[in-house]
Curated annotation (Swiss-Prot):
TM ranges: 236-256
Gene for this chain: LAMP5
The species this protein was found in: Bos taurus
Signal sequence extent: 1-29
Compartment annotation: Cytoplasmic vesicle membrane; Cell membrane; Cell projection, Dendrite; Cytoplasmic vesicle, Secretory vesicle, Synaptic vesicle membrane
UniProt keyword annotation of Membrane present: yes
Protein name per its UniProtKB record: Lysosome-associated membrane glycoprotein 5
Topology, Extracellular side: 30-235
Protein topology in the membrane: Single-pass type I membrane protein
């Protein structure tokens, strides 16, 4: 019995060690993150990199702002009125994250963890007439804020921490193996734990890739958002039309010049019949 008990204890101890090793390995992997926002020429844009096993597995560049409604007492101290806090993601934020085969996560904390942003990315496969195609998307956003923080909130009623979550989110949909790029502003609505409050998240200057990064610190081919493609078309269309119009004018002038030259070389028939006798 003693030998059997020792064997069982040995197996249990090995399991515990393996679990501890797995936990420590995961924690170390999550800590391989870098905030490279100082490299950005845009002071409002942040750059975050998650690295596992010595290579980049998630890269994210974006500017983020949160519009947060909150209640304050009116001047009569009886009624409540709603104010608005504009909270921007600042440089020097703390960042965490991890990468998986079909699920990756980015977490950002700033202002002494008064604010926290969590972004969850999923990769999934779909059957299409052309065969199976894989895409990735932003599937969940969570924003935690503390309305007792005095920089952005002034005399908030029932001040404290609140959590705002997205619901049924499917944003930034991108073909697998590509990065998502969008300069235009995009808004995501988040339902807050503060009753009847909706937080608006505004993203801009976005460039993200949470899966299948081939080169270290280098984005793969860009998949541009429809808004950027439309704006690019609107910018290039006048140029194309101008070139076509210029070409039409040049062709018209050339044809006119050739026609004028040909008619100038023809014999001119006098209109005065009395001049016919001088011809020949």
């Amino acid at each position: 019995m003693d030998l059997r008990r020792r064997a069982l204890l040995g197996v249990d101890g090995l399991r515990v060690l393996l679990m501890l090793f797995h936990t420590v390995t995961r924690i170390m992997a999550e800590q391989e993150v870098e905030n490279l926002s100082g490299l950005s020429t845009n002071p409002e844009k942040d750059i975050f990199v998650v690295r596992e096993n010595g290579t980049t597995c998630l890269m994210a560049e974006f500017a983020a702002k949160f519009i947060v409604p909150y209640d304050v007492w009116a001047s009569n101290y009886v009624d409540l009125i709603t104010e608005q806090a504009d909270i921007s993601l600042t440089r020097g934020a703390e960042v965490k994250g991890h990468c998986g085969h079909d699920e990756s996560e980015l977490q950002v904390f700033w202002v002494d963890r008064a604010y926290a942003l969590k972004m969850l990315f999923l990769k999934e496969s779909h059957n299409t007439p052309k065969g199976p195609e894989a895409t990735w998307k932003l599937s969940k956003v969570q924003f935690v804020y503390d309305s007792s923080e005095k920089t952005h909130f002034k005399d908030a009623v029932s001040a404290g921490k609140h959590t705002a979550n997205s619901h049924h989110l499917s944003a930034l949909v991108t073909p697998a193996g590509k990065s998502y790029e969008c300069q235009a502003q995009q808004t995501i609505s988040l339902a807050s734990s503060d009753p009847q409050k909706t937080v608006t998240m505004i993203l801009s200057a976005v460039h993200i890739q949470p899966f299948d990064i081939i080169s270290d610190f280098v984005f793969s081919e860009e998949h541009k958002c429809p808004v950027d493609e439309r704006e690019q078309l609107e910018e290039t269309l006048p140029l194309i039309l101008g070139l076509i119009l210029g070409l039409v004018i040049v062709v018209t002038l050339v044809i006119y010049h050739i026609h004028h030259k040909m008619t100038a070389n023809q014999v001119q028939i006098p209109r005065d019949r009395s001049q016919y006798k001088h011809m020949g």
